[in-house]
């Protein structure tokens, strides 16, 4: 399978304009990428621009801190699903609750978003750069208990992004629970994306989807994969 289908072409910068989102979606359509990931204010626009394609519309809630009340995350999710017709939701785990040892609260927070998103998939960003390896293992357990479909490494807005080491840990744990892994944060070239997939990533979140596809085409010695 072409690497394009692993990629969620991402633009979550606060200064992103309508023109930027239009360009993102045009690129996703041209390169037949797996999805686009945008803030909720642009989810409806992305759906409109990509109607009739198989590019998934992904949005984020509780982003990037995860510190919103569960009710707020759930409402944002329901609006995105019911009104903007998104395909998937990436939420940020409540890091404060997790670090405080309030694991039931973390699970309840995730479950609230999962319920609001039904029947669509939820990915939970655990911000691996802020966790020890033992905490990453625990976070995967809580993500699964909350009913989410994927665990995701990073927001891209903290002090670090995805690493091979972290993806390997998440993939090992995710396999135990039957959930997927999304690697995101700092993945900007084909070799890095390929290494993340080899480490166990099922999805790649990146702002460099075009460059990665073009790198793959060069590596394969042919035209762009479709």
Task: Say what each PLM segment does.
Residues 47, 68-83, 131-142, 165, ...:
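Catalytic cores of alpha/beta
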Residues 1-84, 137-138, 142-143:
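Conserved N-terminal beta1-alpha1 strand-loop-helix module at the mouth
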Residues 25, 29-45, 63-65, 89-107, ...:
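Glycine-rich, proline-tolerant flexible connector loops at the mouths of alpha/beta enzymes
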Residues 26-34, 48-51, 79-82, 86-87, ...:
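Generic secondary-structure signature for well-ordered alpha-helical cores
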Residues 59-63, 83-97, 145-161, 185-188, ...:
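Glycine-rich phosphate-binding active-site loops on the catalytic face of alpha/beta enzymes
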Residues 20, 24, 42, 73-76, ...:
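General structural feature for long, well-ordered alpha-helical segments within catalytic domains
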Residues 40, 44-65, 103-128, 145-146, ...:
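Alpha-helix-loop-beta-strand connector modules within alpha/beta enzyme cores
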Residues 3-10, 34-38, 56-62, 87-91, ...:
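Hydrophobic faces of well-ordered beta-strands that scaffold small-molecule active sites
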């Amino acid at each position: 399978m072409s690497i394009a289908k692993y990629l969620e072409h991402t633009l979550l910068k606060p200064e992103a304009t309508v023109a930027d989102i239009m360009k993102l979606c045009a690129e996703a359509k041209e390169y037949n990428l797996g999805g686009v990931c945008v803030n909720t204010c642009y989810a409806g626009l992305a759906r409109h621009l990509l109607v009739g394609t198989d590019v998934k519309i992904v949005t984020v809630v509780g982003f990037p801190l995860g510190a919103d009340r569960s009710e707020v995350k759930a409402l944002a999710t329901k609006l995105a699903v019911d009104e903007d017709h998104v395909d998937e939701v990436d939420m940020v785990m409540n890091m404060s609750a997790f670090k405080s040892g309030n694991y039931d609260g973390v699970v309840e927070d995730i479950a609230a978003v999962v319920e609001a998103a039904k029947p669509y998939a939820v990915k939970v960003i655990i911000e691996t750069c802020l966790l020890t390896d033992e905490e990453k293992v625990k976070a995967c357990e809580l993500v699964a208990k909350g009913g989410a479909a994927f665990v995701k490494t990073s927001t891209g807005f903290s002090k670090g992004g995805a690493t091979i080491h972290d993806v390997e840990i998440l993939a090992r744990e995710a396999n135990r629970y039957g959930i997927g892994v999304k690697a995101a944060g700092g993945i900007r070239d084909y070799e890095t994306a390929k290494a993340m997939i080899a480490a166990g990533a099922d999805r790649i979140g990146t702002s460099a989807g075009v460059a990665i596809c073009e790198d793959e085409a060069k590596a394969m010695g042919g035209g762009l994969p479709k």
